Amino acid sequence: MAARRRHVAAGAGAPAPAAGEWPAVTAGGGAAWALSPVEEVGTKQELMRRTGLPPRDLRALDPALSSAASASSCRPSAITGRDRAVVVNLDRARAVITASEVLVPSPRDPAVAPLVRELRARLALAASPTPAPSPSPPQHGMAVGMDGSISPSQASRGGEEAAGNGKDGEALGGGDKALPFEFRALEVCLEFACKSLEHETCTLEKEAYPALDELTSKVSTLNLERVRQIKSRLVAISGKVQKVRDELEHLLDDDMDMAALHLTEKLAYQSSRFDIDKEASELEDHSSRDEEGVEGGGGGDGDDETIAGGGSFSPNTDELEILLESYFVQIDGTLNSLSTLREYVEDTEDYINMMLDEKQNQLLQMGILLSTGTLVSSCAIAVTGVFGINVHISLYDSPASSAAFPCAAAGIVAGSLALYLAALLCYKRAGILQ
C-alpha cells in the first residue's frame, strides 16, 4: 500500500495523528503528517527520499530505541549536518530539519507535542511579513518556500527595536538579514531542549534543598531515602545536560560541522555550480564547433577563470556561531546550577558523616566506661568470693567478727570506686576519653 499523507493548514483543527507519525512543519507554519516506517514498509524509503538521510539516522530518532537508550543512560546527543538535512537529537528535542520543513517523530508523546506546537507557531510567525511601524528603511529577510526557493520578504522587529536599531541598520547597509529556515527551526529545537532541561533542574532544586535541610536536622530512614532518589535524579539530569553542552561545544569548535548546517546556502551553491557547469559545457561545445574562437583563446580563458573562481562551499558561520553560543551559555548555566546542587549534596553527606562519626565516638566512649565498670565489678566479686569460701578461720572465733563484715564490705566498695576513678583518670590522660 502506498504511503499516505494528510496536509493540514496552519491553525486549522487537525485531528490528532496516530502513534508513530512524523509531523512535517513547513516554512509557512503548515503541518503535514508523514506515516512512520512502523505502519508502512515504503514510508521509510519516502522519508529517506525527502530528507536524503541514511537509515541509521532515522533509527537514532526512533522513539522506541530512544526510550531504551534513555532508560540505560547511554542515549547520545548530537546535531549532525547531512547533505540535505540536519538531524537534531537533543534529549526530548528530536527532529529532522530540511531547507523547507521540519519532521518530528512521535508527536503523541506529551513531552514532544509542545515542540510541534512551538515549531508551528514560531515558523508561521517568522514567515508572515509585517510592515515596519517606523519610517526607517525596512529590513529585508529571506523566506524559504516549500520547494526550497528563496524569495525576499520584509520583516519588522517592532517599534522600539526598529527605532533603537535604525542607525545600526543603516551602518550595516539596510538592516539585518533574517535567519534561514533551518536556523530558525534549529533555534526552536535548542530552546525547547534547554528550557526542558532547565525546568527539570528547577524542579529538582525545589525538591532537593528542603529535603537536604530536613536531613541535616533529623537523620531518618525516610529522609535518607528521599535524598537517595534526589541524588539519582541529579546524576541523570546532569548527564543529559553535559551531553548537550558537549555537543554544542563540539559544534562551536568545528567550522566544518557548522558549515554542514547551512542547508539553504548549500542548495543555492549547488544550484549556482550546476548553472556554471551547464554554461561551461555549452561554451565548450560552441568553442569546439568554432575553430577560430578556439585559436583566439580569449573566451576560453575567461570561462576557465569563472569556473575556477567558484571555489569550494565555505559559508559564513558567524550567525550560526552566535546562535549556538547563546544556547551554550544557557545550558552551561544550567550545568553550573546542577554542579552547585551536587556540591550541596556532597556537603550534606559530609555533614551527616561527621554527625554519625560523632555518635559513633560517643558510643565507643560509653563502651569503654561500661567495660571498665565491668572489670572493677569483677574484681570486687572475686574478693567477695574469696571471703565466701567455706573454710574455718580464726576470724570467725574472734569477738570482733561481727564488726569485721561491714568493714570488709565497705572496703571492697571503696576499693572498687577508687580503682574505677583511677582508670578514668588514666583514660583522660591518654586521650581516650574527652
UniProtKB/Swiss-Prot annotation:
Putative magnesium transporter. It comes from Oryza sativa subsp. indica (Rice). Residues 1-21, 126-171, 279-311 are annotated as: Disordered. One of its GO terms (molecular function) is magnesium ion transmembrane transporter activity. Pfam families: MRS2-like. It is a multi-pass membrane protein. Belongs to the CorA metal ion transporter (MIT) (TC 1.A.35.5) family. Keywords: Ion transport, Magnesium, Membrane, Transmembrane, Transmembrane helix, Transport. Residues 279-291 have a biased composition (Basic and acidic residues). It is found in: Membrane. Residues 9-21 have a biased composition (Low complexity). This is Putative magnesium transporter MRS2-D. Its main location: membrane.
